[in-house]
């Protein structure tokens, strides 16, 4: 019975994402929070791919932020995860990789240098379930943050997706809560707790084209302990 539930969960996710999609978001965070917090508003392109198979499922996404002058790309970030079925066992082992690269500009809009978003490697256990029309997944994982001085941490994630109004409305997103060292240079640094959530709402104009919004909610995430709420305007193409 549980394998049947897993099957329908995977099939639902496949239908919702139609294997893969491309999103384009306008992020007005500088207009909302001011240039003291964010230098500019910018566009973000997101590619998502979900692929289930008889052994489990693979999910990945890639974000590209066009946050440099003249709309040039300034950062790329990616996550890849794999979950595994174990017969009728209700939990699914999970592995995940996160990481990225970026560049920054100096005052004359020339590229001033580059930076790396430190790799993170996760190993944990996932539990998929259903609440009404909403299919959900939650996992707890050990997180290895590859800072200059390694940070050993834990992450809890909740993921949701559901269709309503005869599939014209899709609600989806995730919420992450994790720990990491306050200082990436000190292995004995105190820990901080970070929260990040990105709920999305989509109006599905056709089976391929959607209009919607994502609200980026973060606490203790962007170089300080402040809470930021950054809504976007977005379009999505499923293919």
What do these predicted ranges mean?
Residues 1-21:
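Bacterial Sec-dependent N-terminal signal peptides
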Residues 17-68:
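Short glycine/proline- and aromatic-enriched beta-strand/turn motifs that initiate or cap beta-hairpins
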Residues 21-27, 37-41, 71-159, 188-189, ...:
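Outer-membrane pore/translocation modules
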Residues 26-30, 53, 64-68, 97-103, ...:
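Transmembrane beta-strands of outer-membrane beta-barrel pores
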Residues 50-52, 81-83, 126-130, 159-163, ...:
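Transmembrane beta-barrel domains of outer membrane proteins
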Residues 55-60, 86-93, 131-138, 164-172, ...:
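Repeated loop/turn-to-beta-strand initiation elements of outer-membrane beta-barrel proteins
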Residues 141-210, 216-219, 237-239:
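Outer-membrane beta-barrel transmembrane domain signature
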Residues 228-239:
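Outer-membrane beta-barrel "beta-signal"
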